[in-house]
Every structure is written in structure tokens, then in C-alpha cells.
Amino acid sequence: MHQPANAPRHSIYYDYTVHQPWLPSEHPAQSLQRVVIAGGGPVGLTAALELARYGVPCVLLESEQQVCEGSRAIVFTRRSMEILQQVGVAHRVTQNGLPWRFGNSFYRGERVFRMEAPHDDNDRFGPMINLQQQFLEQYLVEACQANPLIDLRWGNRVTAVTQHADHAQLQVDTPEGPYTLQAEWLVASDGARSG
């Protein structure tokens, strides 16, 4: 039985919210889903919002019950910001992030490399912006929760996938035990160790 952390992570700069797990006993039997997304990080959340923009419903499975701890993604490029604008969260990123154009690398007190990104006055976004990943994830989570086409299931971990001719069958573990889910399409966005 999957038991994700159910106490807020400790942080001096971010207030973690623990979301209630989606439990199979509280929902009707599962029918064939159009799209299932495994992984509720920036890629999975953005994919769900993009699908919803085109009217495609999806189920988004996240093994944890809160957004990530620390930042595996902290710098977002202009192109990333354009995608985030499409899904409705770019304004929050620019409002709270730190934009920059220059970067320096130092070794033993001496600058050994300087990077300068081009920027035109007509560009909608700066070349890069820094924002901790948990803030970006929270903005994306809030957008997903506001969209009726997205079924966000916290505390649901994919443990096995079987490919069939016309669908995928997933074994999903939750804090109360496993259930089976079938999908016409499966998006694996559960990180570098996906498999």
C-alpha cells in the first residue's frame, strides 16, 4: 500500500499544502479514460492543461500529496514562458520570479565565463526567469484544480503498465490499496527514473 508523506514538508520560504489522496472506495468504478498522465510535476501539470485547452479530458496521477521539495527546475526560458502563458500561469511566474539576461561563472575568485542572452524590446518575456519549482507547481496545480476536464489524483502511484492493442492498463497504488485504470493514451511524465 502506497503511503506518501502526509505531513507538510518543512521550509522557511514555502508553505506546503498536503492534499487529500484520491481513494478508489470514494469513487465509482473506473471506465476507460481517454488520457492518463503519470506524474504531477511541471511537465505533467502543463500537459494536462494543454490537453484541456483542446477539450481533451485527462486523469493526472501524482504519487505525492504535495508539490515537490526543492527545485529540480529553477530557471525558465523565454520559450517555457510562452508555453506557461498558453496554460494561464505565466503572469504569476513573472510577478514572483526574478528575470535575468546575464550569467557569470567564477573559479577561485575569477570570472571564467560570462553568458549574455539576447533580448529585444519587443520580446514578450525576458530570456530567463528564476522561480523555485514548488511555486511553479503550485500555480499549475491551482489551474488544474480549476479545470473540470482535469481529474487530479493525489497520492496515486503507478506501479505497472501493460500495453494492449488499443489501450494501456495501469496498476495504481493508493493509501488504501491498489486499483486498475485503463487509458487510450498514457503520458509518462514521472521523471528521469520513469519506467
Can you name each region flagged by the protein language model?
Residues 155-159, 174-175:
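Conserved SAM/SAH-binding loop
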Residues 72-145, 155, 162:
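Active-site-adjacent segment of FAD-dependent monooxygenases/related oxidoreductases
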Residues 31, 176-185:
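Core beta-strand elements of the Rossmann-like FAD/NAD(P) dinucleotide-binding domain
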Residues 188-195:
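Flavin (primarily FAD) binding-site architecture
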Residues 37-39, 48, 58, 84, ...:
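Conserved structural-core and active-site-/substrate-pathway-adjacent residues in large, well-folded domains
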Residues 150-151:
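Short, conserved active-site loop motifs that form the nucleotide-linked donor/cofactor pocket
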Residues 1-35, 53-54:
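Extreme N-terminal leader/targeting segments of oxidoreductases
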Residues 30-60, 65:
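N-terminal Rossmann-like FAD-binding beta1-loop-alpha1 element of flavoenzymes
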